[in-house]
């Protein structure tokens, strides 16, 4: 982190920075103010990266409502996920570099330079405010250039939307990423998981479902454990 941000370790001691609890409490207070009348929390890779750290910080410092981004009518969006979908379904609308296998490199600092995204702020990449402002500008660009993808992401900001979508569509596609590599699967809904809200079982239609439906229970369990991703 020190190498990435360029922070001098001595400055952490010499400057009057807040300690871990104080910083967490400040974040908590700010988020509480934002969410007082419902909020959309937007970031860049915030759902899979930033939020787990935030929740852990709030938990460790005995601050309540660690799930505030998805409770009390609050919702969230991830610009990184929108950008990944654009790189698959509408790559002509955004400039990006590729790795040696041809997959998009979607680092925020590179994307901002390639697409001439600039802000009037005296800092650089990996500064929290700088990255937030760049993310905001990138979000605006994606909304303008790729409105269908952006609007879909906006609709899916609600946690109940996936269930409603799957009930309304017998067959649908699901785009997932393994590292930078996208995978598109045709799937159908099996049902929910009683012990886990907002988690669902779907069937991968790459495999013939008739052969699965006809199996005895013991054979079905064996099939589910053979490594093939029939049910996700």
Task: Give each language-model segment a name.
Residues 1-12, 31-148, 156:
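Metal-dependent phosphoesterase core characteristic of DEDDh/y 3'-5' exonuclease domains
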Residues 141-232:
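Acidic two-metal-ion nuclease catalytic site recognized across multiple nuclease folds
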Residues 15-29:
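Glycine-rich, highly charged phosphate/nucleotide-binding loops
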Residues 17, 21, 48, 129-132, ...:
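Generic detection of long, well-ordered alpha-helical segments
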Residues 20-21, 33-34, 54-55, 179-182:
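A short linear-motif detector with a strong N-terminal bias
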Residues 16, 45-47, 206:
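Short glycine-rich, polar/acidic loop-and-turn segments at beta strand-coil junctions
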């Amino acid at each position: 982190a020190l190498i990435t941000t360029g922070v001098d370790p001595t400055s952490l001691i010499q400057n009057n920075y807040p300690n871990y609890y104080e910083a967490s409490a400040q974040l908590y207070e700010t988020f509480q103010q934002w969410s007082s009348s419902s909020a959309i929390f937007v970031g860049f890779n915030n759902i899979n990266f930033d939020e787990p750290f935030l929740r852990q910080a709030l938990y460790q410092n005995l601050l309540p409502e660690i799930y505030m981004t998805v409770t009390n009518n609050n919702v969230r969006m991830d610009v990184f996920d929108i950008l990944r979908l654009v790189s698959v379904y509408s790559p002509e609308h955004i400039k990006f570099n590729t790795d040696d296998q041809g997959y998009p490199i979607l680092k925020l600092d590179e994307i901002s330079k390639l697409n001439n995204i600039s802000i009037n702020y005296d800092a650089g990449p990996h500064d929290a405010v700088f990255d937030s402002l760049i993310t905001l500008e990138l979000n605006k660009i994606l909304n303008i250039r790729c409105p269908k993808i952006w609007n879909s992401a906006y609709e899916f900001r609600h946690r109940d939307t996936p269930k409603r979508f799957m009930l309304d569509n017998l067959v649908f596609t699901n785009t997932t990423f393994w590292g930078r590599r996208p995978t598109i699967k045709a799937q159908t809904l099996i049902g929910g998981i009683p012990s886990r809200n907002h988690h669902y079982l779907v069937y991968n239609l790459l495999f013939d479902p008739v052969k699965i439906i006809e199996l005895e229970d013991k054979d079905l369990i064996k099939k589910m454990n053979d490594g093939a991703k029939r049910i996700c």
